[in-house]
Curated annotation (Swiss-Prot):
The encoding gene: rplT
Gene3D superfamilies for the chain: 6.10.160.10, Ribosomal protein L20
Keyword Nucleotidyltransferase belongs to the record: no
Keywords: Ribonucleoprotein, Ribosomal protein, RNA-binding, rRNA-binding
NCBIfam families assigned to the protein according to its UniProt record, in alphabetical order: rplT_bact (TIGR01032)
Protein name: Large ribosomal subunit protein bL20
CDD domains assigned: Ribosomal_L20 (cd07026)
Length: 118
């Protein structure tokens, strides 16, 4: 059985890591040992933040809905309670977009909610 030299394989593996570290600062983008650690850490951050993104956006939507509801004299919790009672099934993403960009439609929803809360 012939001897296998690892030069080609090692070069390919190193190149893959160095390419993934493109754009990093300092030695993180061209020294394999350091780049490997940086790429692994970047992957961990990416994995974590794909999950955190969902929480962050939900918090943003809630803040926007709260601001829009308070302009019409309702708190967020009373507004959401009224939505459930009025059986209006719009999600927070759509409601926050309406509160920012379509104030007339949002005001109409708030008026429906006020009728059900009272």
């Amino acid at each position: 059985m012939p001897r296998v030299k690892r030069g080609v394989t090692a070069r390919a593996r190193h190149k893959k890591v160095i390419d993934a570290a493109k754009g990093y600062r300092g030695r993180r983008n061209n020294v394999y040992r350091i780049a490997k650690q940086a790429v692994m850490r970047a992957g961990q951050y990416a994995y974590r933040d794909r999950r955190n993104k969902k929480r962050v956006f939900r918090a943003l939507w809630i803040a926007r809905i709260n601001a829009g509801a308070r302009e019409h004299g309702l708190s967020y919790s009373k507004f959401m309670n009224g939505l459930k009672k009025a059986s209006i099934e719009l999600d927070r993403k759509v409601l926050s977009d309406m509160a920012i960009h379509d104030k007339v439609a949002f005001a109409a929803i708030v008026n429906q909610v006020k009728a059900n809360v009272a």
